[in-house]
Amino acid sequence: MIRFLRNNALYFAWLICSTGTVMSIYYSYLLNIEPCVLCYYQRICLFPLSIILGIATYREDNLVKIYALPLSITGMVIAVYQICLQEISGMTIDICGRVSCSTKLFVFGFITVPMASALAFCAISCLLILSGSKKK
């Protein structure tokens, strides 16, 4: 199982990233839900990863983690910060625009958008790290 995951880590990372990109566009343009500022920052990290990981998967380039891991970790840090804004009372942020960064919007009825984002970025990061290992 681990060998299968290691051999296909880039593909799974790209699949998670592409799913997140499609879901983000679906929420914005089809459901007309305006994202907050922190969501835009997470998108800045997520959208390029779809292209970068897609090319790396096609070329079987495991060295892509040098470029993709910083984007993934940055997105995860922003998502965790937004989770803290939502869950810790008294935490505020001054950069929020018309949409509050602390507003909870649930995906599938039980997980918030930043929590789904943090999980996706965490999974992408783990898969990128795993893709470079050469253990037999």
Swiss-Prot record:
It holds the Pfam family DsbB. The keyword Transmembrane helix applies. InterPro entries: DiS_bond_form_DsbB/BdbC (IPR003752), Disulphide_bond_form_BdbC (IPR012187), DsbB-like_sf (IPR023380). GO terms for biological process: protein folding. Disulfide bonds join C36-C39, C96-C101. Keywords: Cell inner membrane, Cell membrane, Chaperone, Disulfide bond, Electron transport, Membrane, Oxidoreductase, Redox-active center, Transmembrane, Transmembrane helix, Transport. GO terms for molecular function: protein-disulfide reductase activity. GO terms for cellular component: plasma membrane. It is a multi-pass membrane protein. It is found in: Cell inner membrane. It comes from the Bacteria. The chain crosses the membrane at residues 7-26, 41-60, 67-84, 109-133. PANTHER family: DISULFIDE FORMATION PROTEIN-RELATED, SPBETA PROPHAGE-DERIVED DISULFIDE BOND FORMATION PROTEIN B. Belongs to the DsbB family. BdbC subfamily. Required for disulfide bond formation in some proteins. This is Probable disulfide formation protein. It comes from Chlamydia caviae (strain ATCC VR-813 / DSM 19441 / 03DC25 / GPIC) (Chlamydophila caviae).
